[in-house]
Design a protein with these regions (language model features):
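FAD-site-proximal beta/loop scaffold in flavoenzymes
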Residues: 11-42, 141-196
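Short hydrophobic core segments
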Residues: 1, 46-48, 119, 162-169
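Short amphipathic alpha-helical segments
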Residues: 3-7, 58-60, 176-180
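Beta1/beta-strand and adjacent pyrophosphate-binding region of the FAD-binding site
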Residues: 41-51
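A conserved short coil-to-beta-strand element within the FAD-binding core of flavoproteins
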Residues: 116-129
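N-terminal Rossmann-fold NAD(P) dinucleotide-binding loop
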Residues: 54
Length: 196
């Protein structure tokens, strides 16, 4: 999934999986000497997305020696304890830090996540390189189409950013392989399975 905001065409923006794959391949192939890795060293890194892939980006950025790392999460911070509507044996929807946030907390002294926040614009310099991102806090409100994140007035902020990583999740499976084999798909793009 991509982000559609002004400045998206700036250089220094990578999809999270590309960032992680290039770094891992360069490490395995050449111990990072082939120049193919995307380095976060001495950079202000902003990661859009709060899932496992975003966590991997936080951990990798910390290990590469980034100047700062901020993880933008559009959802609210979960509670410390289970809510009454989240009983066992359901997965506990509670606040936790995965390894990436734990490493960032040890290095920087705080959880890198900014909850209920979204990026509204990407700012670039004269060379077209990302230099900062504009953000705003959101409030989830019911609309005629369901719940939607609505910007909260007076919460705009600009964060320094030399490296922007997009970890916003996946929209669906890649279709070229399914097309090559003539596979039928559901309306959501998933392979249509035969029923018996």
């Amino acid at each position: 999934r991509d982000i559609r905001v002004p400045g998206r065409d700036a250089s220094g923006i990578y999809f999270a999986v590309d960032f992680l794959s290039r770094n891992t391949k360069s490490l395995l192939d050449s111990n990072l000497t082939d120049g193919k890795a995307v380095s976060a060293k001495d950079k202000n890194v902003v990661i859009i997305g709060g899932g496992d892939t975003g966590t991997d980006c936080v951990g990798t950025s910390i290990r590469q020696g980034c100047r700062s790392v901020t993880q933008i999460e559009i959802m609210a911070c979960p509670p410390d304890k289970r809510a009454s509507n989240n009983p066992w044996p359901e997965w506990p929807m509670t606040y936790k830090q995965d390894y990436g946030q734990q490493e960032a907390t040890l290095v920087a002294g705080a959880d890198p996540r900014r909850w209920l926040t979204t990026v509204t614009a990407i700012n670039k310099n004269d060379k077209g390189e990302v230099v900062s991102v504009d953000t705003v806090k959101v409030s989830w409100q019911k609309t005629e189409k369901g719940f939607a994140p609505i910007p909260v007035e007076g919460t705009a902020e600009t964060l320094p950013c030399d490296l922007l990583l997009i970890a916003m999740g996946f929209v669906g499976p890649e279709t070229p392989v399914m097309d090559a084999f003539g596979m039928e798909r559901t309306p959501r793009g998933l392979p249509l399975m035969a029923t018996t």
